[in-house]
C-alpha cells in the first residue's frame, strides 16, 4: 500500500476490533501499540520487519496516532515485534486475526484488491 492517509482509518478499525481503544491505559499498552505497528509495517513497509528501513512517512504518522513525542519511539518499539511474532504463538495468533480483519475491511472498501 502507498496511501498513508488511510493509516488513521486503519487505526480506527483496529480500535473497533480490539475494543476499548479510547481508554488511556489501553492505548498506552506496549503490546497494543506493537501489534498495530506490526500490521502497518506489514501493509506499508514489509521489508522493515526483516531489518530494512521503514518507508518514508510511516513513522511520523504512527508516532502521531500512538501519541509519541518523536518518531524514534516507533523505531524503538518495533524492534521486538518480529521476535515476538516468531516466538509467541498467542501473540502471532492475535496479529494474524487483527491483520485478517483489517485486510477484509480494506477489500470491502475497495482500497486493496
Description of each model-found segment:
Residues 1-16, 107, 111:
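General nucleic-acid-binding
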Residues 14, 59-60:
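Generic structural marker for isolated residues within well-ordered, non-membrane alpha-helices
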Residues 40-45, 66, 81-82:
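Generic structural signal for hydrophobic core residues of well-folded globular domains
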Residues 77-85:
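DNA major-groove recognition helix of helix-turn-helix
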